[in-house]
Amino acid sequence: MIKLISDNDVFEVLKLMNKSTEQNNYSFERNESKWISFLLNAIQEQNKNNPHYLIIGDYIDNKLKGFLLANSFVGHYNNNVIMDVKDCIIDIDNQNAYTVIRLYNYMMDHIRKHGGKRWRADSIRAHEDTLKYAKLLQLKYNADLYYSAHGTIGE
């Protein structure tokens, strides 16, 4: 069952994010307090019925299997509103593709309901996992694949 993440779901979300971070050994610089602040702000905005924020969870037997955190921005090329997936975190001990699709289906309905048409999802996963994730979205939602580069300037 997909449901909106509420004030009382925060601890479950934090546990799943921490589990995902530990299991995947992401190579980005992590600042938990910044991410938690972003999450809490997004939940507050969603609680105000701000359609530019969406935080949803996929629950099976009242257990969080995955969550999606997204907010929108206005594209500087064409002034279109784009829903930007910030996090799609899945419990890797479960059916990943099934949960991803359920979360994205809900997001697509949310975008349509509020008059939107565009979305995007970047990934910080390792190359192989990023490609699988992107190809799933391409297959299911006819998404275009783009490439990006992330770098660090040395001292």
Where do the PLM segments sit?
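Conserved beta-strand in the GNAT
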Residues: 57, 63-72
